[in-house]
Amino acid sequence: MAAAAGPVGDGELWQSWLPNHVVFLRLREGLKNQSPAEADKPATSTSPSCPPLPPHLPTRNLVFGLGGELFLWDAEGSAFLVVRLRGPSGGSVEPPLSQYQRLLCINPPLFEIHQVLLSPTQHHVALIGTKGLMALELPQRWGKDSEFEGGKATVNCSTIPIAERFFTSSTSLTLKHAAWYPSEMLDPHIVLLTSDNVIRIYSLREPQTPTKVIVLSEAEEESLILNKGRAYTASLGETAVAFDFGPLVTVSKNMFEQKDREAVAYPLYILYENGETFLTYVSLLHSPGNIGKLLGPLPMHPAAEDNYGYDACAILCLPCVPNILVIATESGMLYHCVVLEGEEDDDQTLEKSWDPRADLIPSLYVFECVELELALKLASAEDDPFASDFSCPIKLHRDPKCPSRYHCSHEAGVHSVGLTWIHKLHKFLGSDEEDKDSLQELTAEQKCFVEHILCTKPLPCRQPAPIRGFWIVPDILGPTMICITSTYECLIRPLLSTVHPASPPLLCTREDAGVAESPLRILAEAPDSFEKHIKRILQRSAANPALLKSSEKDLAPPPEECLQLISRATQVFREQYILKQDLAKEEIQRRVKLLCDQKRKQLEDLNYCREERKSLREMAERLADKYEEAKEKQEDIMNRMKKVLHSFHTQLPVLSDSERDMKKELQLIPDQLRHLGNAIKQVTMKKDYQQRKMEKVLSPQKPTITLSAYQRKCIQSILKEEGEHIREMVKQINDIRNHVNF
């Protein structure tokens, strides 16, 4: 589920040389320079007779990463050792194994550091211990490779003591939990939970005076929203042990006693040692900030007699909607709880009747319970289960690459947990169905996947060796888990970007771009495919983690426990590998037999189809010939039909529009011919008349009258005028004639 299969390219280069870097040699040398009392603890407490184990050792996390660089806290030198995981200028060239930067504290902490925590703005690092807290300011970067102060070997860093006077004056108080306020837009604030059951919020601008204070003890006695059995918890002295922030949400108006507008705030989930969870809302957007009313304890469904354990130690809110809380107990139990919105039940309705300011309390639905194998359960533990009981505090770590996965670190090793049902839960909550039984079916069908990554306590007689650092590299170098053991050995394990079942990849899942997609591959992607069935069979519920060898070379473990350890590993290989592979083999053989029978049946069907295809081809040829003949006959019939229709249309008694127009034109032709004949006769008569006149004019006659020149001129002018008059009259007559004729 956590480990990635196959190479990841150039990103594997740094994974090969990092364990051999000189910084780990320096840290191991610093470990040898501890006080003799601390160095003699393992030797005096470990013997072949296996005496009782010492009290719990504090779990540390002294490692974090930023921008392709790994920061390791050097307790002896009160400094960070910075190792670049990338080569020069971001390339894949392996850097020198002796090259690193040292960030030295100007004002080193006087208390032991148990945890380092990077701020959301990535400009400060919190140095957390049980007796104090400091904020280290990271120096500026410049240069070609963007190193601190251009790549100096040693860089001085300023530190800001947080609540220094408070911890100095209150020597009996201890710091239980610390976390940065999750906003990246505001000035850095850090939230502290101390052993006096008080949560204080400090700003780096005023590190000695808390910005806000949440007194949990008084809230237990004076809160207006309490269940009936809460009065007994104060007398038992139950205190908060951890808290975590959820994603930013919008809260109601009366949460911060604001009447004009709603506000956005971060939900703060507070876990008590008895397993109860409280909720409040924190908003520092506007100075001096707002703290909502403390709600709780949040009801847990389904109810349990032991309230799901009395040794709760850690809480984690996964970044999803609805919020999913992970509650861890020292006995190794993990509870995955879905935060449901509050509903008005009888108890809350009664309380609201006398308290109008009371809000609905969200409830926790315990979706599933998971038990971690903190220490390896050997064969002898079955006879005496109380002899092998082991419990220790658990630290929960988010996975920045996969929101549905988180990791658990404790004194005996590291586990990875993947929640594969989150997307189905979102689909169920987003639907309009009111059937709650499907949710129960979902919890019964698919559980989370737990993988035991590292075991630092393989034998009962060995002391726990808690890891000193844990970090997930979310950089482009590839998602990778880095674990720093108690002896400063670096263990690296690649991670997948998504949650997958803890089963090996099948050959049929390999992608081949040259092979076309076949119907069998399409069937393999179905929800009920045989491939998924084989994956479910091969799914492992346990695994053999990486075992951390003991640093005590002179003391050999008892042979009985070594045999039990080998027997346990053999049993895991037998039950989780060989047996499951045998079951998968039987299923595959059964499947192959069925497929062979189907193949024979399909071959018979194929032969039958070939014969049918042959007969169909012959029939098609015959039908083609008949079709050609029928087509020719049809064409002849069509031609005959055209002739018949033509003759039929010609003999129809009803004339068409064109025929009626032609008839009218033909009826007008005789009248036009008659008018034209009359016009021709008139023209002929005029022609004859003019010819007679011309003959008379042309015939020789003796002039009887002699006219003078003046007379002739007058006569010519008169004739000319009369001729023009006659010409106009002829023209008018022709126009009238043309107008009358046509």
Curated annotation (Swiss-Prot):
Predominant location: nucleus
Residue positions where Phosphoserine is found in the record: 35, 380, 438, 518, 541, 699
Coiled coil spans: 597-652
Annotated gene: Nup88
InterPro entries linked to this entry: Nucleoporin_Nup88 (IPR019321), NUP88/NUP82 (IPR037700)
Origin organism lineage: Eukaryota, Metazoa, Chordata, Craniata, Vertebrata
The keyword Transport appears for this protein: yes
Gene Ontology MF terms: structural constituent of nuclear pore
GO CC terms: nuclear envelope; nuclear pore
Task performed by this protein: Component of nuclear pore complex.
Organism of provenance: Rattus norvegicus (Rat)
Subunit structure, interactors included: Interacts with NUP214/CAN. Interacts with NUP62 and NUP98.
Assigned keywords, A-Z: Acetylation, Coiled coil, mRNA transport, Nuclear pore complex, Nucleus, Phosphoprotein, Protein transport, Translocation, Transport
Name of this chain's protein: Nuclear pore complex protein Nup88
Cellular location(s): Nucleus, Nuclear pore complex
Keyword Transmembrane helix carried by entry: no
